[in-house]
Regions:
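Alpha-helical membrane-inserting segments
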Residues: 15-27, 45, 49-57, 76-80, ...
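Small-residue packing motifs within transmembrane alpha-helices
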Residues: 6-8, 42, 62, 93
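Structural signature of hydrophobic alpha-helical transmembrane segments
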Residues: 32-45
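Membrane-water interface at the C-terminal end of transmembrane alpha helices
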Residues: 3, 7-8, 102-124
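Membrane-interface helix caps and helix-loop-helix hairpins in membrane proteins
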Residues: 28-31, 59-60, 86-88
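Membrane-helix boundary connector in multi-pass membrane proteins
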Residues: 80-96
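Internal alpha-helical transmembrane segments of multi-pass membrane proteins
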Residues: 53-75, 91-98
Length: 124
């Protein structure tokens, strides 16, 4: 079980940082690590909050966990970005973030469950 928790946490972090990296690249932002960390910080903090709220370690690959992690990461990240980090939260940005994070935070979980079910069926 601990193995699944580690994989889930790593994949979730990869999705969040990947979202930020792609966004920075598409907007011709400085490709340096410092800029990436500064931009990713509210969403990474949001992800940690989301994991705690969802108790994601209990069922890290579950669809309910994915949905809660997605929404909580998005909401916490946007609130932190706007009110703590004093950065923009334009409607178009919120929509893109909602779609990207929704597809990828839930998508990898869907694929993982399908593969696990397939292995279970093959072993039976």
């Amino acid at each position: 079980m601990q193995h699944r928790v580690s994989i889930a946490a790593g994949l979730d972090a990869f999705v969040v940082v990947g979202f930020v990296a792609i966004g920075r690249r598409n907007h011709d932002e400085d490709p340096g690590v410092v800029g990436l960390v500064e931009t990713a910080a509210p969403f990474v903090i949001g992800l940690v909050v989301a994991w705690l709220l969802a108790r994601a370690w209990r069922d890290p690959w579950g669809w309910q966990t994915g949905a809660l992690v997605w929404i909580a990461t998005l909401v916490a990240g946007m609130l932190l970005r706007r009110f703590v980090f004093d950065e923009g939260t334009a409607a178009s940005f919120v929509m893109v973030a909602t779609g990207f994070l929704g597809v990828f935070l839930n998508g990898w979980r869907l694929v993982a469950r399908m593969l696990a079910n397939r292995r279970s069926a093959a072993a039976a």
